[in-house]
Amino acid sequence: MGIDEASVVHNSFQLDRKVSMLKTELNVDALVEQYLSGKEYSVAILRSLKTGELQAYPIELSSPKDSDGNSMLSKSVKSNDAEYVSPVKLGKAKDKICKLAIDSFKALGGKSYGRIDIRCNDEGKAYFLEANLIPGLIQKTGYFP
């Protein structure tokens, strides 16, 4: 909600303008966070019926860069189907993303299935963005396998 090209700010004037817009137009408070310019992932979490273990299925989400060179999944990008979804290659990065997703899911009390969104900084350090413990299962809009 309210995420657009003006969401990444570089000074207090831009910050004040964006926060005021959110308050005035959407009647919501602003959550201000550091912009993470690395890759973004959506990780489906499923509990195996056979083993009972949690399994993680990450996909990488990317979108066209805006005029400032930032990439974000804004409402406009999603509504125009401009995001790209690709599999995550095997390796340490995938293992790290899957571990963070499963740990986050457990910490939030997730039981059977859910989706965890993660974004990395420039150095590749992964950060929890949000959880959807009742994710949409519609393939086109749900980012769930």
Residue spans of the language-model regions?
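Short, functionally important structural connectors and interaction interfaces within domains
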Residues: 1, 27-28, 80, 105, ...
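A conserved helix-loop-beta module that forms one wall/lid of the active-site cleft
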Residues: 1-8
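Short small-residue beta-strand/loop micro-motif enriched in glycine and branched aliphatics
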Residues: 2, 83-86, 140-142
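Gly/Ser/Thr-rich beta-alpha loop segments that engage phosphate groups in nucleotides
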Residues: 4, 40, 137-138
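Hydrophobic pocket-lining residues within nucleotide cofactor-binding pockets
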Residues: 9, 36, 137
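Phosphate-binding site of ATP-dependent enzymes
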Residues: 12-92, 99, 120-127
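ATP-dependent carboxylate activation and anion-phosphoryl transfer catalytic cores
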Residues: 91-145
